[in-house]
């Protein structure tokens, strides 16, 4: 089976509609069993969507209604129009760039039977840009979490505290995958990446029989512009599993080589 993660940037991205079309075409062709998206937004002031596309599974505790330009809803609809059906859920975490409801989404080919809404940050202020939530869904007997973490050196909302909450919740499941933007460089020792490893989680990139360099960020992006290594290549988008699994391959997608760039991040596609 194939799993994919992408920090999609969605409505913020220049040429958004054209890039969304490229992404949907790729998903329709590859049909990963599950794909997880971060920075999935909608305009807060937009009209209500009305009826949600087929397969929508509301996340517990989400009081923000779907709006007409919701990125996840648009992706679901466009896939449905191509005859490719996914079950999906969306969870907003905060106000983004002053005008968006920003959150994360998970899409699954198998029916979603449960969903989990995890507050990872200390703050629960929807207007605070440091608020972090994670959406988990159960499909079959496996849980999949779409993850967008804070930074290791953030004194107010440190990565380590957020990881403890996530690891305890996801680690209690029989099998769980964490897919997303961890904001922790795999090449930096003694920080977030090593903490995840020490917690017993398995990096599917390292398990893969075939893999590329894995770098998903190759230029300065929001959240990293003030870092000493702002412009350096980073492998911060990752897929982890709670146990060792056989991974055939792991490759960067939408990095501008095999597929066009559709976001300020590239994505990761693995095959088990």
What are these regions (language model features)?
Residues 1-34, 58, 80-81, 85-272:
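Active-site regions of metal-assisted phosphoester/phosphodiester hydrolases
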Residues 8, 30-53:
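Short, conserved active-site loops that position catalytic residues or coordinate cofactors/metal ions
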Residues 13-15, 44-68:
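Short, flexible/disordered intra-domain loops and linkers
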Residues 66-86:
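Alpha-helix-centered segments that form part of catalytic cores
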């Amino acid at each position: 089976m194939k799993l994919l993660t992408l920090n999609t940037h969605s409505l913020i991205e220049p040429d958004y509609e054209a890039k969304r079309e490229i992404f949907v075409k790729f998903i329709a062709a590859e049909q990963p069993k599950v794909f997880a998206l971060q920075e999935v937004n909608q305009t807060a002031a937009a009209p209500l969507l009305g009826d949600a596309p087929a397969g929508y599974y509301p996340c517990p505790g989400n009081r923000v209604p779907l709006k007409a330009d919701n990125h996840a809803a648009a992706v679901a609809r466009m896939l449905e129009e191509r005859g490719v059906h996914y079950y999906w859920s969306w969870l907003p975490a905060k106000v983004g760039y002053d005008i968006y409801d920003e959150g994360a989404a998970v899409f699954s080919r198998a029916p979603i039977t449960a969903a989990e809404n995890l507050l990872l940050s200390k703050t629960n202020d929807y207007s605070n840009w440091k608020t972090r939530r994670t959406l988990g869904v159960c499909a079959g007997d496996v849980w999949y979490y779409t993850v967008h973490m804070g930074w290791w050196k953030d004194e107010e909302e440190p990565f380590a505290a957020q990881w403890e909450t996530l690891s305890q919740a996801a680690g209690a499941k029989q099998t769980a995958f964490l897919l997303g933007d961890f904001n922790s460089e795999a090449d930096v020792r003694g920080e977030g990446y090593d903490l995840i490893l020490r917690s017993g989680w398995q990096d599917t990139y390292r398990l893969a029989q075939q893999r590329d360099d894995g770098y998903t960020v190759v230029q300065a992006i929001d959240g990293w512009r003030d870092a000493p290594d702002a412009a350096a290549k980073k492998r911060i988008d990752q897929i982890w599993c709670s146990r060792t699994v056989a991974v055939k391959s792991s490759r960067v997608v939408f990095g501008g080589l095999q597929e066009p760039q559709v976001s300020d991040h590239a994505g990761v596609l693995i095959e088990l």
